[in-house]
Amino acid sequence: MIRRPISFVVGIAFRQPRFHHLPIFRERDKPLRKRRGNVILPSLTYHGFLPEGVHCTNLQAVRDRFATNPLRVELFQKLEKFLHWASTTGRFSCAYIDGGFVTNKAAPSDIDVILQTSVPYGAAAFHAMEPFFAQGIDSIYEIYSVHLHFWCEGFPGAMTDFRRFFQYLRPQDAAPSGLNEAARKGIIRVDL
């Protein structure tokens, strides 16, 4: 018999759910309810990545965990400004955050962001993305240090679901850590 770890909350013992190791994001979870408050992020793994899955939190928790030196503080401030811009459009439900910023790298160079439209694939979703393409993806990178990607529900099958794609480790990141190419890592979701 496999025993699950026991946790204690206010003096009451309970067993962790049987499926606590599975990724948080599943296609059928849409739409996820809004999360408020400071949701604590899990500790980084031994290899310096978030545990596998999508970790829902807020910007304060991201700041607390990852803005740990002057360079990271600067990157976080740029991210915060970028997400404020995206949020003020009212056309995006959430942002997924990934890249070296959400690892133990001392000097990450940028942040990967996936904006998810609040409407499904179609003209309204493309209209939501339009201001960002008008600004220019390269210009956004120069100003905010953000590699920008988009996702909307119902994208055709040939389109890459970056939410899943960014959970895979690149071979050049996996090999130095002694991980295989199929290894996965976590990403962060922040509601806008």
Language-model features, listed with the residues they occupy:
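N-terminal amphipathic/basic-hydrophobic helices that include classical n-h-c signal peptides
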Residues: 1-38, 118
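Catalytic core of pol beta-like nucleotidyltransferases
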Residues: 25-96, 102-109, 117-192
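Structural signature of FAD isoalloxazine-binding scaffolds in flavoprotein oxidoreductases
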Residues: 113
